[in-house]
């Protein structure tokens, strides 16, 4: 994979893997909860793999962003960096919500088993499983949208900077300074040194 922030798809792959991790959990639950002895540990396997792989992909995305586009080298608006980092935060919020819903589901099913209700374990777990998957899809789309928007606008501003075009005339430091020559002459007259006669006095 090429180390270039503009040319890879780590953000898309990270969110895709995370969504698949939660979605495949529906099939895992169907197999593990319909058995005579429910196996809860399998419910954490695919989400765990999705979280780990997604986090690694996002780590490289942030790392390459910091290496390729430091502020000292390129002058783009920092708001796009904030948008990009917000996309990263949404991804980890996605992870947190998914794990919390999964833990709540396992706790609910455990209480059913303690009450000797084994027949509808999978059916009762479906609302939690679909809620986790749906939430993951929505937050992943938000994360991808924010990250790719930042990618796009930072690239545009960097290309403008390379061509010598100001990215935003109202926010750059190279503004024209207006000097009033008449005012300067007036100040010079007021600050002129005293004459020789005044000095002798």
From Swiss-Prot:
<feature type="transmembrane region" description="Helical">
    <location>
        <begin position="126"/>
        <end position="146"/>
    </location>
</feature>
<dbReference type="GO" id="GO:0005886">
    <property type="term" value="C:plasma membrane"/>
</dbReference>
<feature type="region of interest" description="Disordered">
    <location>
        <begin position="165"/>
        <end position="201"/>
    </location>
</feature>
<feature type="compositionally biased region" description="Polar residues">
    <location>
        <begin position="192"/>
        <end position="201"/>
    </location>
</feature>
<feature type="transmembrane region" description="Helical">
    <location>
        <begin position="9"/>
        <end position="29"/>
    </location>
</feature>
<keyword id="KW-1133">Transmembrane helix</keyword>
<keyword id="KW-0472">Membrane</keyword>
<dbReference type="Pfam" id="PF17534">
    <property type="entry name" value="DUF5453"/>
</dbReference>
<feature type="transmembrane region" description="Helical">
    <location>
        <begin position="86"/>
        <end position="106"/>
    </location>
</feature>
<feature type="transmembrane region" description="Helical">
    <location>
        <begin position="42"/>
        <end position="62"/>
    </location>
</feature>
<protein>
    <recommendedName>
        <fullName>Uncharacterized protein MG028</fullName>
    </recommendedName>
</protein>
<feature type="compositionally biased region" description="Basic and acidic residues">
    <location>
        <begin position="182"/>
        <end position="191"/>
    </location>
</feature>
<dbReference type="InterPro" id="IPR035217">
    <property type="entry name" value="DUF5453"/>
</dbReference>
<keyword id="KW-0812">Transmembrane</keyword>
<keyword id="KW-1003">Cell membrane</keyword>
<feature type="compositionally biased region" description="Basic and acidic residues">
    <location>
        <begin position="165"/>
        <end position="174"/>
    </location>
</feature>
């Amino acid at each position: 994979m090429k180390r270039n922030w503009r040319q890879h798809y780590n953000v898309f792959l990270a969110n895709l893997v995370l969504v698949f991790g939660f979605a495949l959990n529906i099939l895992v639950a169907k197999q593990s909860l319909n058995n005579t002895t429910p196996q809860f540990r399998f419910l954490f396997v695919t989400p765990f793999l999705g979280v780990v792989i997604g986090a690694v992909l996002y780590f490289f995305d942030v790392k390459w962003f910091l290496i390729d586009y430091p502020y000292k080298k390129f002058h783009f608006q920092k708001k796009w960096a904030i948008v990009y980092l917000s996309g990263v935060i949404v991804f980890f919020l996605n992870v947190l919500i998914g794990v919390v819903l999964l833990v709540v589901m396992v706790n609910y099913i455990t209480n059913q088993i303690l009450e000797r209700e084994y027949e509808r374990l999978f059916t009762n777990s479906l609302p939690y499983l679909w809620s986790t998957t749906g939430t993951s899809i929505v937050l992943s789309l938000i994360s991808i949208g924010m990250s790719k928007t930042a990618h796009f606008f930072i690239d545009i501003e960097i290309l403008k900077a390379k061509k010598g075009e100001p990215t935003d005339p109202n926010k750059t430091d190279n503004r024209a300074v207006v000097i009033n020559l008449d005012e300067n002459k007036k100040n010079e007259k007021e600050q002129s040194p005293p004459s020789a006669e005044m000095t002798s006095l």
